[in-house]
Amino acid sequence: MSKPTTLYDKIWNDHLVHEAEDGTCLIYIDRHLVHEVTSPQAFEGLRVAGRKVHAPEKTLAVVDHNVPTTDRTKPNPDPESAEQIATLAQNAKDFGIEYYNEFDKRQGIVHVIGPEQGFTLPGTTIVCGDSHTSTHGAFGALAHGIGTSEVEHVLATQTLIQKKAKNMRAVVYGTLPDGVTAKDIILAIIGEIGTAGGTGYVLEYAGEAIRALTMEGRMTVCNMSIEGGARAGLVAPDEKAYEFLKGRPKAPRGADWDAAMRYWETLRSDDGAHFDHEIRLDAARLPPIVTWGTSPEDVISVTGKVPNPADIADEAKRLSKERALHYMGLAAGTRITDITLDRVFIGSCTNGRIEDLRAAAKIADGRTVNGNVNAMVVPGSGLVKEQAEAEGLDKIFIKAGFEWREPGCSMCLAMNPDKLKPEERCASTSNRNFEGRQGFKGRTHLVSPAMAAAAAIAGHFVDVREWH
């Protein structure tokens, strides 16, 4: 009888090409996603070496980080961004790679378009020069970010050199209360383990609360695995995953689909499989969560107060949290619901999908954005935007006073015109609240889409459970 195996180990073993005596491995890569920021040097390296892309049919390119989310018929106001976008277009043409430019309705954030095109499939290995590649793990794919030199290596060989990670599991049992979402699950996990808690691990999410999530919700959870330090996040595929993928443009069809399904149905951790570390959370006890500091681990219930660093025994950690409070312009003991806002951003590869926009629109419907707040909604892709408009969500947002934008990474990061000004405070559905992440000296609080929409209307954080 074979030894019980984890989902991660199964996918890893199926893709292992070679293992050296020191544990360094060569693994085969099934899918490679490329965007404009981390790929220029990689393609240039291929040119200099006179190499071709080994498997262009397994590579998909899209612009997302640098594209403006306003009128795209006008020139890009940032020459460097415009150059990166033009460079990706030329590289895709030169190397024979499929490419979605800023005018293609399939364009969007790389981690939104992969699943919606059926490019992301269970049991595959997926890489991209982007840390939030872990998103694709929601489908039972082993997916993680890589550096630019590794992008070149994958383009040239369709393989990657790395050492195997350890296995970790987060079991989220019970049922989520109304007003509490997948975003709150992952923020709670990061708050529990810290931003280094998953270092050296691939993190599998399990339990009834995870199974109950939609695919959009699972993508939100897996997306932020990297914020917990993990190399990748995984959810075993099930009927929800298969239903999401069936009929997608790049998904298998007919007999190929049937063959794929036979393999996909083996993709789960066996009973009794060994995990090097495991944590458990009760979904029923989770509140809507807000980050208060400059790390994703700085989490608190919306009904709570900003913590006092003086209560922290470890000196280095205490000083770090004192610095965070100073940067955020907050005082210990401040009620979270007393924190007022200047900006609200709903979008990103964490929360820019149709389910996220529906949740925000449900809160915004019939209400008006606070006069002191500038709020924007940025769909994760052109297809998400098209679907939202077909459902009338754009009209709800616009009537409420939100800006309705074109798809892209937008205000998740300060690499395009959507930025915070110094000391502006933003409720954001994105994934990182580091110093300067959304703009120089900008202050970021991470929340769910419903929480962000409610904050935009109230002008400060509110407990969205009271609005349900």
UniProtKB/Swiss-Prot annotation:
Its cofactor is [4Fe-4S] cluster. Pathway: Amino-acid biosynthesis; L-leucine biosynthesis; L-leucine from 3-methyl-2-oxobutanoate: step 2/4. It catalyses: (2R,3S)-3-isopropylmalate = (2S)-2-isopropylmalate. Keywords: 4Fe-4S, Amino-acid biosynthesis, Branched-chain amino acid biosynthesis, Iron, Iron-sulfur, Leucine biosynthesis, Lyase, Metal-binding. [4Fe-4S] cluster binds at residues 349, 409, 412. The keyword Hydrolase does not apply. InterPro entries: 3-IsopropMal_deHydase_lsu, Acnase/IPM_dHydase_lsu_aba_1/3, Acoase/IPM_deHydtase_lsu_aba, Aconitase_4Fe-4S_BS, Aconitase_4Fe-4S_dom, IPM_dehydratase_rel_enz, IPMI_cat. Binds 1 [4Fe-4S] cluster per subunit. Its EC number is 4.2.1.33. NCBIfam families: leuC, PRK05478.1, PRK12466.1. HAMAP family: LeuC_type1. This is 3-isopropylmalate dehydratase large subunit. It comes from Nitrobacter hamburgensis (strain DSM 10229 / NCIMB 13809 / X14). The lineage of its organism: Bacteria, Pseudomonadati, Pseudomonadota, Alphaproteobacteria, Hyphomicrobiales.
